């Protein structure tokens, strides 16, 4: 009478062990995915018809971006003016605020830049390839606008500067990994220029 009970107990024990192992293996990819980290590279390109400075030359990694822009816009020159490198985890959020690192700007009236990136998630696309989805993205700048001039007590001429906010915001972006992607464009204070925002997401191994 005890033998069937013993066999049943052994079978039940083995079943529980097998179930635990199956659950553990099933959860491993999810855990690995949730712990993945990524580099967020945001770059600002300025398109114009003026001669580009060699110090702001577009790197080879953005050559495909410039080629695509040339097919849609008639600007003769493109230059890289700002680069921001941040780090984020899968399903994470990112917020950056700071003084722009754009060259040749007025040190007494700098440009302030900020961008936010919410709910970055690694998920397969329609072809089964890993891609990045972003729930919301915003890029903004506070740019100085000269509104008037005045002279101080010494007779020196000074500018009156007010700051205006410009930017773009969007929801539900999809990007391929390791691929520079044009997010959008903004006008600048110059009528013959256009600013392009380029975003690249790279996995950190």
Regions found by a protein language model. Give the residues of each.
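Sec/Tat signal peptide C-region and signal peptidase I cleavage site
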Residues: 22-26
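N-terminal secretory signal peptides that target proteins for export/translocation
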Residues: 1-9
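Bacterial N-terminal signal peptides
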Residues: 9-21
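Outer membrane pore-forming secretion/assembly proteins and partners of Gram-negative envelopes
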Residues: 27-205
């Amino acid at each position: 009478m005890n033998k069937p009970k013993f066999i049943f107990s052994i079978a039940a024990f083995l079943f529980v062990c097998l179930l635990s192992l199956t659950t553990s293996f099933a959860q491993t990819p999810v855990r690995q995915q949730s712990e993945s980290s990524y580099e967020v590279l945001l770059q600002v390109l300025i398109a114009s018809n003026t001669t580009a400075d060699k110090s702001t030359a577009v790197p080879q990694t953005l050559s495909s971006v410039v080629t695509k822009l040339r097919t849609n816009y008639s600007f003769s020159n493109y230059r890289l003016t700002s680069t921001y490198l941040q780090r984020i985890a899968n399903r994470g959020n990112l917020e950056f605020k700071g003084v722009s690192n754009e060259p040749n700007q007025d040190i007494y009236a700098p440009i302030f830049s900020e961008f936010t990136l919410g709910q970055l998630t690694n998920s397969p696309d329609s072809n089964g390839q890993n891609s990045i989805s972003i729930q919301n993205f915003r890029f903004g700048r506070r740019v100085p606008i000269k509104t008037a001039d005045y002279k101080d007590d010494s007779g020196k001429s000074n500018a009156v500067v007010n700051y205006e906010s410009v930017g773009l915001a969007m929801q539900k972006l999809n990007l391929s990994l390791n691929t520079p992607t044009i997010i959008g464009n903004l006008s600048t204070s110059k009528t013959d220029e256009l600013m392009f925002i380029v975003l690249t997401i790279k996995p950190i191994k």
